[in-house]
């Protein structure tokens, strides 16, 4: 609970350069005095805030020396948690870190719950809830663009957009409630047309965030991408080229890949959850047939299909069936083996089969065409404008989390109901019900209107030292 002093290891387990034990709370100074002996200068009570000190860590019971360490001392409220904070920077072995934590707990701190340091930062007003959640997104970012989106949220880009929409809603709500509560006052009636205009403008802002949430989901979870094609067209070679390592087995024997091989790759800043699948063909081999069925299952769930064809061979019935089955779905046709002099594939026939589907000539063996593929996928994820930037030069706010998306969807739905109410001549009383619900749903994102159960669920996903 807030008010006591907590401690936890803040670095990953195992050996490393340093191991950090973090302490936060009103008793942090007492813990520090009980377990640390400075090598030089004044005692702990005379230390300035945000200073480093060399000394030894001792056990408070028998005063045995545990380790030589640097201590960082930070005084409230200018700390991450807004409380007094001390960090013990020990040698990075499991034993000195464990012994230091044990000494700290013995001196009066208790072991922190998962995410409790960040929760205290939220409760202390250091961060709002969206910013607090961004910390775990920074840690788990899979690519440069994913990191950029997380840092943008941590810096408050999303929170500022949400608060702007909430302020607009609140201004409209306040005017309507004043008209209801003080009918005797000579307040201007803004009229149903003005109300509709304001509501649609607010709804557009929410709709824009929802539209960009697809990109946010891709950066957070990865774009589910499946490499498909008949056997021996170069699917595994393509995956190895994208991974830049020999991950899949490449042979001249059709049917070598019998099970799906899944990897995360960073393709120009976009995280792809890429799957190399068994070649699609009719086969009597039971194991290979299971692999083909799995390929079809992956294809049904995919965000993108990379269809690999052999440019040195004619289109087969299997190729054509596969291409026709992908009509209307996000897919890119990759004509492989473009490094070979022999080219038998009928390009006019191919174009007639795929319509507007992009076609790129590649050589998985030589790496040709991969840059063009990367640029195409970036456009498919981001659009022609890329990630985009806000007026202040920072990245535009992206909605990356399902919780935020669901809250925006609820707010959007309440605004739609409010617009319907205005269109049907409903009284301001009915209108304010949906406006309040929309305002509260948005507040769940920043933590202004959120219950303890939601906070428990969010912070329990953090690691103990965060």
From Swiss-Prot:
Main location: cytoplasm
GO cellular component: cytosol
Full protein name: tRNA modification GTPase MnmE
Natural source organism: Heliobacterium modesticaldum (strain ATCC 51547 / Ice1)
InterPro entries referenced in this protein's UniProt entry, alphabetically: G_TrmE (IPR031168), GTP-bd (IPR006073), GTP-bd_TrmE_N (IPR018948), GTPase_MnmE (IPR004520), MnmE_dom2 (IPR027368), MnmE_helical (IPR025867), P-loop_NTPase (IPR027417), Small_GTP-bd (IPR005225)
Pfam families (UniProt xref): MMR_HSR1 (PF01926), MnmE_helical (PF12631), TrmE_N (PF10396)
One of the GO biological process terms: tRNA wobble uridine modification
Entry function: Exhibits a very high intrinsic GTPase hydrolysis rate. Involved in the addition of a carboxymethylaminomethyl (cmnm) group at the wobble position (U34) of certain tRNAs, forming tRNA-cmnm(5)s(2)U34.
NCBIfam families xref list: mnmE_trmE_thdF (TIGR00450), PRK05291.1-3 (NF003661), small_GTP (TIGR00231)
Chain residues that bind GTP: 232-237, 251-257, 276-279
Note describing how the cofactor binds: Binds 1 potassium ion per subunit.
Gene name tied to this protein: mnmE
Record family assignment: Belongs to the TRAFAC class TrmE-Era-EngA-EngB-Septin-like GTPase superfamily. TrmE GTPase family.
Enzyme class: hydrolase
HAMAP family xref list: GTPase_MnmE (MF_00379)
PANTHER family membership: TRNA MODIFICATION GTPASE GTPBP3 (PTHR42714), TRNA MODIFICATION GTPASE GTPBP3, MITOCHONDRIAL (PTHR42714:SF2)
Highest taxon of the lineage: Bacteria
Gene Ontology MF: a single term: GTPase activity
């Amino acid at each position: 609970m807030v008010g006591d002093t907590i401690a936890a290891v803040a670095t990953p387990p195992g050996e490393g350069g340093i191991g950090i034990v973090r302490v936060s709370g009103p008793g942090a100074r007492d813990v520090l005095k009980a377990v640390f002996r400075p090598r030089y200068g004044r005692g702990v009570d005379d230390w300035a805030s945000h200073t480093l000190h060399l000394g030894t860590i001792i056990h408070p019971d028998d005063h045995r020396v545990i380790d030589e360490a640097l201590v960082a001392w930070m005084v409230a409220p200018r700390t991450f948690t807004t409380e007094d904070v001390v960090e013990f920077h020990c040698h990075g072995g499991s034993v000195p870190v464990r012994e230091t934590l044990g000494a700290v707990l013995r001196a009066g701190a208790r072991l922190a719950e998962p995410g409790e340091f960040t929760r205290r930062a939220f409760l202390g007003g250091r961060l709002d809830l969206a910013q607090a959640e961004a910390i775990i997104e920074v840690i788990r970012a899979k690519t440069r663009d994913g990191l950029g989106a997380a840092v943008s949220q941590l810096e408050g880009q999303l929170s500022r957009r949400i608060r702007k929409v909430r302020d607009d809603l609140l201004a409209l709500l306040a005017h309507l409630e004043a008209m209801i509560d003080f009918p005797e006052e000579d307040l201007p009636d803004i009229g149903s047309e003005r109300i509709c205009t304001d509501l649609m403008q607010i709804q557009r802002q929410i709709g824009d965030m929802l539209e960009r949430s697809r990109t946010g989901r891709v950066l957070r979870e990865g774009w589910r991408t499946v490499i498909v094609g008949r056997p021996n067209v170069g699917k595994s070679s393509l995956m190895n080229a994208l991974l830049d390592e020999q991950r899949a087995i490449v042979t001249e024997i059709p049917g070598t890949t019998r099970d799906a091989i899944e990897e995360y790759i960073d393709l120009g800043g976009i995280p792809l959850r890429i799957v190399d699948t068994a070649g699609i063909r009719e086969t009597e081999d039971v194991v290979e047939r299971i692999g083909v069925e799995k390929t079809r299952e992956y294809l049904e769930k995919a965000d993108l299909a990379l269809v690999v064809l052999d440019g040195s061979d004619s289109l087969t019935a299997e190729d054509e069936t596969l291409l026709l089955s992908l009509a209307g779905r996000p897919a890119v046709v990759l004509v492989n083996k473009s490094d070979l002099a022999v080219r038998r594939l009928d390009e006019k026939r191919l174009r007639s089969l795929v319509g507007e589907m992009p076609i790129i000539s590649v050589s998985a063996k030589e790496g040709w065409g991969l840059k063009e593929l990367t640029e195409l996928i970036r456009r498919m994820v981001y659009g022609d404008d890329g990630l985009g930037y806000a007026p202040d030069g920072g990245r535009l706010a992206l909605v990356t989390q399902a919780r935020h998306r669901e809250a925006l969807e609820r707010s959007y739905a309440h605004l739609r109901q409010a617009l319907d109410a205005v269109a049907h001549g409903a009284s301001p009383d009915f209108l304010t019900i949906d406006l309040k619900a929309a305002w509260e749903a948005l507040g769940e994102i920043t933590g202004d209107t959120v219950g303890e159960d939601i906070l428990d669920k969010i912070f329990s996903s953090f690691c103990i030292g965060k």
